[in-house]
């Protein structure tokens, strides 16, 4: 326990526009310390500085409040809320299907995981989990694993940039563009596509989808090897990451940390293995771990996880080739959002063929389509918790229904929010420069933290 005698005599707070006062106070302290005996009296001076929320090294609008003594961090706290968008509250005023458009924008670097967790929750409430077409589940897995690779590439790129490895940033974003191009081909959008829907996916793969993915599978392994050759044995990279941001298994369990940070302690915890969903139990892949408990171990885990994701994508491509023509949306027309939309010749709206199919199939089908789009599906009352393994850890959703066409409550357990609790444990007692490394190894996304 800290006693009053151990506390600093004076704390100087640096806000943003008070630098002149800080300099003046520091000079006064320096002058007084020249007197006999004053040096020892002021030896414990501390300064509180704000790193962020505009700092380029804080992964968005994260504010780190650091109390430093010299170059040593004595206390570290996180200031969040600068990117609050009220998504969870907005979901209470939208239909169950419209909610996908909102949740995909939370953790904007891994949108397919947000969508999948949401849809799995809705499907569990509806009791149709086992009725989802296999082809739709395979597409979900493929899109999530491609998304995992793109998210890890951003983590390595931004982490490298913050430590001065600009080449890593260029390589990471270059390879990510290849994956975003695949997303655009399949969903029409590079990010935030709302492609995964309750009951399946919005549309089947286009003709050019699988060939583009096959080309990606031949190119990415070589590109990833380039990044490994650049950083794995790089003297400066290892000096900045080895032993930095240390957090052991006890600390992770106490704070509820998941994802690469937890697996860097040697614990092989991965929901794809321990609580499989979307048929993950039928895929062949390994859970990557490391026992260093530091930033370098987390870097290695992300690099190796990308290779495991490529293995899963290869298996998905093989299954999709065998299931061409199979449905990608649940067959119950009272629940199924139309999954065969086609763009008209003007590039807007739906094609005449699609409209004719809806209106000419049956009067009952037209009524169901109208009610589905205007009112939305009715979900039986109840509550569920569903979790998926996102690039940052356990992404959970607690969903409550009161039997209506809109959620009563949807709460997300975002791993970025939970993992930020580790900042103090990782940074306190270390150098200011090492705080950058520690935060980069957590890889928080503030859209998911603040929601």
Swiss-Prot record:
Single GO MF descriptor: quinone binding
Keyword Translocase among UniProt keywords: yes
Cellular component GO terms held in the UniProt record: plasma membrane
UniProt keyword Ligase present: no
Keywords for the protein's UniProt record, in alphabetical order: Cell membrane, Membrane, NAD, Quinone, Translocase, Transport
Domain of life of the organism encoding this protein: Bacteria
EC number annotated for this UniProt entry: 7.1.1.-
PANTHER family listed in its UniProt record: NADH DEHYDROGENASE [UBIQUINONE] IRON-SULFUR PROTEIN 2, MITOCHONDRIAL, NADH-UBIQUINONE OXIDOREDUCTASE 49 KDA SUBUNIT
Family: Belongs to the complex I 49 kDa subunit family.
Protein name as annotated: NADH-quinone oxidoreductase subunit D
Gene behind this protein: nuoD
């Amino acid at each position: 326990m800290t006693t009053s005698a151990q506390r600093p005599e004076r704390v100087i707070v640096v806000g943003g526009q008070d630098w002149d006062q800080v300099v003046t106070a520091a000079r006064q302290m320096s002058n007084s310390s020249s007197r006999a005996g004053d040096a020892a009296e002021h030896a414990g001076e501390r300064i509180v500085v704000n790193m962020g929320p505009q700092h380029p090294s804080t992964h968005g609008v994260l504010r780190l409040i650091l109390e430093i003594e010299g170059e040593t961090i004595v206390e570290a706290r996180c200031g969040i809320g600068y990117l609050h968008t009220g998504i969870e509250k907005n979901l209470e005023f939208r239909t169950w299907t419209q909610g996908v458009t909102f949740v995909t924008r939370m953790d904007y670097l891994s949108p397919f995981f947000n969508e999948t967790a949401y849809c799995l929750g809705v499907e569990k409430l509806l009791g149709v989990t086992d009725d989802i077409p296999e082809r739709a589940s395979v597409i979900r897995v493929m899109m999530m694993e491609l998304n995992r690779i793109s998210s890890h590439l951003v983590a390595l790129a931004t982490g490298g940039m913050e430590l001065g490895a600009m080449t890593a940033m260029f390589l990471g974003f270059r390879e990510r563009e290849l994956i975003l191009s695949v997303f655009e081909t399949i969903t029409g959008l590079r990010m935030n596509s709302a492609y995964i829907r309750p009951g399946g996916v919005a549309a089947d793969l286009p003709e050019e989808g699988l060939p583009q993915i096959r080309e990606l599978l031949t190119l990415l392994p070589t590109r990833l090897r380039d990044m490994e050759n650049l950083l794995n044995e790089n003297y400066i990279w290892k000096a900045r990451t080895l032993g930095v941001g240390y957090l052991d298994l006890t600390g992770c369990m106490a704070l509820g940390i998941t994802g690469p940070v937890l697996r860097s302690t040697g614990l092989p915890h991965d929901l794809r293995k321990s609580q499989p969903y979307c048929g993950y139990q039928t895929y062949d892949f390994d859970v990557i771990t490391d026992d260093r408990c530091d930033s370098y171990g987390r870097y290695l885990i992300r690099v190796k996880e990308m290779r495991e994701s490529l293995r899963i994508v290869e298996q998905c491509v093989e299954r999709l080739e065998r299931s061409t023509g199979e449905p990608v949306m649940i067959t119950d027309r009272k629940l199924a959002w139309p999954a065969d939309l086609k763009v008209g010749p003007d590039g807007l709206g739906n094609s005449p063929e699609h409209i004719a199919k809806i209106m000419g199939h049956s009067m009952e089908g037209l009524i169901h389509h109208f009610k589905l789009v205007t009112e939305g599906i009715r979900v039986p009352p109840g509550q569920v918790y569903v979790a998926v393994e996102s690039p940052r850890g356990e992404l959970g959703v607690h969903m409550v229904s009161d039997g209506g066409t809109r959620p009563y409550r949807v709460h997300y357990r975002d791993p970025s929010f939970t993992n930020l609790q580790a900042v103090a444990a990782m940074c306190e007692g270390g150098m200011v420069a090492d705080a950058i490394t520690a935060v980069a190894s957590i890889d928080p996304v503030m859209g998911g933290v603040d929601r």
